[in-house]
A protein has these predicted regions:
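Sec-dependent N-terminal signal peptides
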Residues: 4-12
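A domain-start/cap signature at the N-terminus of enzymes
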Residues: 16-59
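Serine-hydrolase catalytic machinery in alpha/beta-hydrolase-like enzymes
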Residues: 30, 57-132, 136, 140-144
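Alpha/beta-hydrolase fold nucleophile elbow
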Residues: 146-157, 178
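Gly/Ala-rich beta-loop-alpha elbow adjacent to hydrolase catalytic centers
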Residues: 156-160, 164
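Conserved hydrolase catalytic core segment
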Residues: 166-176
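The feature captures the conserved acid-bearing segment of alpha/beta-hydrolase catalytic domains
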Residues: 186-249
Length: 276
């Protein structure tokens, strides 16, 4: 009888808490409208742990693509390093896909720099999406939060990495740092490699990372490792002394699994607090 009562009590406790949802601490979701398309984009924002107590402090801002995937991942991976003082605290901002759209169609359209005839989906809105980030997202964050306009980091993966490379080559001063995970250099016959690149005038850090197994030999449709190395070479070619570049191959990682390591190691390289 006691065992039955205990089991019933445990079941009651479980059912009583089953509807409680977990929320990322100090986070909100807002909506911003892109002009002139009038598309609405949800934007996820997380403030650092010290934000409420250090009211005069201006924070670096980490900007992410693919918000539903990247926001919980980067928030979780940076929580302990930031809170324990081994990584600078920062505001995390993730731009999601167009409201009401399928994520795949939104990201393919917004993260690609050219209109690819071979694709059935709409492509080629990278310039427009870059303008949305520059003219709408940045002002909102910097006017409503204590986010730095001189210490911004971009983090993108796959097509998001391609989008970051496009911004690096066309408007490099938008961000101080670029983390390009498994960039889709192959898109539209490697067209990103033919983009006429603007040399950064300010100090810029570029972290390019790719999984060891992102090759056809391991089932990938494209050789992402070679593509990432070609992108590295292009970045080196435009460096006039302002670029600090790091290239990393994530051991044992595929396209599906490389990004968590790429993101946290890239952020540690940029914001890690080194012991003296």
């Amino acid at each position: 009888m006691k065992l039955l009562m205990l089991a019933a009590l445990l079941l009651f406790c479980f059912e009583g808490n089953a509807s409680d949802a977990y929320e990322i601490p100090r986070s909100v979701v807002i909506e911003l409208k892109e002009q002139p398309s009038n598309r609405i984009y949800p934007v996820f924002i997380q403030l650092p742990a010290s934000y409420a107590s250090q009211t005069d402090r201006v924070y670096p801002v980490i900007y992410l693509t693919d918000a539903h995937y990247s926001f919980p991942l980067v928030s979780g991976a940076t929580r302990f390093p930031m809170n324990s003082g081994v990584m600078q605290q920062a505001i995390i901002v993730a731009v999601s896909y167009e409201q009401g759209s399928k994520g795949a169609s939104s990201r393919v359209r917004d993260y690609t720099p050219s209109k690819a005839k071979a694709w059935q989906q709409e492509t080629g809105n990278a310039k427009g999406h870059m303008a949305f980030i520059r003219d709408t997202v940045f002002p909102f964050i910097e006017q409503n939060y204590r986010g730095s306009n001189t210490n911004r980091t971009f983090v993108g993966n796959s097509l998001g990495g391609l989008f970051g490379a496009y911004m690096l080559f066309t408007e490099p001063e938008l961000f101080s740092n670029y983390i390009l995970g498994s960039p889709s250099v192959w898109f539209d016959n490697n067209m990103i490699l033919a983009v006429s690149a603007v040399k950064p005038r300010a100090a810029t850090r570029v972290y390019i990372s790719v999984g060891e197994y992102e090759t056809p030999a391991y089932g990938e449709g494209e050789d992402m490792v070679i593509g990432a190395s070609w992108l590295r070479d292009k970045v080196q070619a435009i460096d006039s002394g302002n670029i600090k570049l790091r290239f990393s191959v994530v051991a044992g990682a595929s396209h599906a699994t490389a990004f968590p390591t790429s993101a946290i190691q890239g952020l540690d390289w940029i914001y890690g607090v080194k012991k003296q």
